[in-house]
From Swiss-Prot:
Its main location: plastid. It comes from Panax quinquefolius (American ginseng). HAMAP family: MatK (MF_01390). It comes from the Eukaryota. GO terms for cellular component: chloroplast. This is Maturase K. The gene is matK. Keywords: Chloroplast, mRNA processing, Plastid, RNA-binding, tRNA processing. InterPro entries: Domain_X, Maturase_MatK, Maturase_MatK_N. One of its GO terms (molecular function) is RNA binding. Usually encoded in the trnK tRNA gene intron. Probably assists in splicing its own and other chloroplast group II introns. It is found in: Plastid, Chloroplast.
Length: 503
């Protein structure tokens, strides 16, 4: 986001939060294009056509059309009458929505930067790694007992998202443009498929709206958590303040003025940790089942009474962490009991002590991974490898490089797994899929092709994980072989991969 600095040198008092004119600037679409190249890279498939959609000529043509009068007038009777989006509707809408998402992120970025500077955090990018959540779980979750797995409800009406964003963006024209997109592509009377299609084509804008909504919900939750504990939550400092937030809290206290303090006394728990990922969140605690049920009650009432979201208690599951696995970011994580025996000796007497401690464990889930490979046409639903037909036009070296890249990325992302058997099976499927693809290209059988090629094809896949490991540890180090079998979390991963986004 530092690219904004050279374009935002104007005095803030002169801007008056008028973001709408930025939609006519070419550099906004250049920033959106650069962001798309970095984020929209797939671990399984390359987005080959993404670069062609954002040519300078198309951007200039789009801006010229927007300058013409009445092109952004929304027709409530027939959306086909809208001349602006009659041609290249999907392309133009995607370009405008991604550019609009870049613009709306500006007030968020400015307040976040000022918040980080006030706290003395200079290099905020060091905190961005997705894998940074797992060392936290290793340190904390083994000492906790219960966990709430929460499915965060979506807003029943997208106007709620607009109202939430209204307190961040003071420009009414920008909000009208946002409503234009929501009405045009998420017709309120159609099934959810339309909204799903909109969110997939305009991921950056959709995630911005959704995260701004979650920020409001988490603000009140962290307020309750801080009031109920003698130890203040360290994570609350990362949430940005809003002008109207204290008004909400004042209203909340006014509603529960009689029973507020009494109820909060029942929720005191200094050992409480909250983690959110995708549309789920985990609230882990060292408390009792009664305390967990009280928090479930508060979550349901908070969603229904203050955010107008219909939710049921069944969306919140209370689990004991030592015998339940958490499905988080492509891993099955658990805090299982690990028995150990210690021999002690006092004078002439020796004795054995049985001790069971909780140990954090992260396993690669095989079934969702096979489902993701089947969706990408590397195997069938049973896990039997098949050829990748769309890659048969590539050269042999390019095909091997494509499969090798996928294996290296999988080894990189799932390097923190304590049990690598599932990962080895996935790599075996990819290896045979590569062999079938090459055999199909040369119109031969897999056995004949492998016999003719030799072991050169297999070397790429067997050494993939070692190449990732030696990026950190020297190949000549004697300790590398021992570390190869241990769990290593790579803290440079800032994007979740396709296989962790299984549905």
């Amino acid at each position: 986001m530092e690219e904004f600095q050279r374009y935002l040198e104007l005095d803030r008092s002169q801007q008056h939060y008028f973001l709408y004119p930025l939609i006519f600037q070419e550099y906004i679409y250049a920033l959106a294009h650069d962001h798309g190249l970095n984020i929209n890279r797939s671990i399984l498939l390359e987005n080959a056509g993404y670069d062609k959609k954002f040519s300078l000529l198309i951007v200039k043509r789009l801006i010229a059309r927007m300058y013409q009068q009445n092109h952004l007038i929304l027709s409530t009777n027939d959306s086909n009458q809208n001349r602006f989006l009659r041609r290249n509707k999907n392309l133009y809408s995607q370009m405008i929505s991604e550019g609009f998402a870049v613009i709306v992120e500006i007030p968020f970025y400015l307040q976040l930067k000022s918040s980080l500077e006030s706290k003395g955090i200079v290099k905020s990018h060091n905190l961005r790694s997705i894998h940074s959540i797992f060392p936290f779980l290793e340190d904390k979750i083994s000492h906790l007992i219960y966990g709430l797995e929460i499915l965060i409800p979506y807003p029943v009406h997208l106007e709620i998202l607009v109202q939430t964003l209204r307190y961040w963006v003071k420009d009414a024209s920008s909000l009208h443009l946002l409503r234009f997109f929501l009405h045009e592509y998420c017709n309120w009377n159609t099934p959810n498929k339309a909204g799903s299609s909109f969110s997939k084509r305009n991921q950056r804008l959709f995630f911005l709206l959704y995260n701004s909504h979650l920020c409001e919900y988490e603000s009140i939750f962290i307020f309750l958590r801080n009031q109920s504990s003698h130890l203040r939550s360290t994570s609350s400092g990362t949430l940005l303040e809003r002008i109207y937030f204290y008004g909400k809290i004042k209203y909340l206290v006014k509603v529960f003025v009689k029973a507020f303090q009494v109820n909060l006394l029942l929720l005191k728990d200094p050992f409480m940790h909250y983690v959110r990922y995708q549309g789920k969140s985990i609230l882990a605690s060292k408390g009792t089942p009664f305390l967990m049920k009280k928090w479930t009650y508060y979550f349901v009432n908070l969603w229904q009474c203050h955010f107008y979201l219909w939710s049921q208690p069944g969306r919140i599951c209370i689990n004991q962490l030592y015998n339940h696995s958490l499905d988080i970011l492509g891993y099955l994580s658990s805090a299982r009991l690990n028995p150990s025996m210690v021999r002690g000796q006092m004078l002439e007497n020796s004795f054995l002590i049985d001790n069971a401690i909780n140990k954090f464990d992260a396993i690669v889930p095989i079934i969702p991974l096979i489902g993701s490979l089947a969706k990408a046409k590397f195997c069938n639903v049973l896990g039997h490898p098949i050829s990748k037909a769309v890659w048969t036009d590539l050269s042999d070296s390019d095909i091997i490089d494509q499969f090798g890249r996928i294996c290296r990325n999988l080894s990189h992302y799932h390097s923190g797994s304590s049990q690598k058997k599932s990962l080895y099976r996935i790599k075996y499927i990819l290896r045979l899929s590569c062999a079938r693809t090459l055999a199909r290209k040369h119109k031969s059988t897999v056995r004949a092709f492998l016999k003719r090629l030799g072991s050169g094809l297999l070397e790429e896949f067997f050494t993939a994980e070692e190449q990732v490991l030696y990026l950190t540890f020297p190949r000549a180090s004697s300790a590398s072989q021992r570390l190869y079998r241990r769990r290593i979390w790579y803290l440079d991963i800032i994007c979740i991969n396709d296989l962790a986004n299984h549905e």
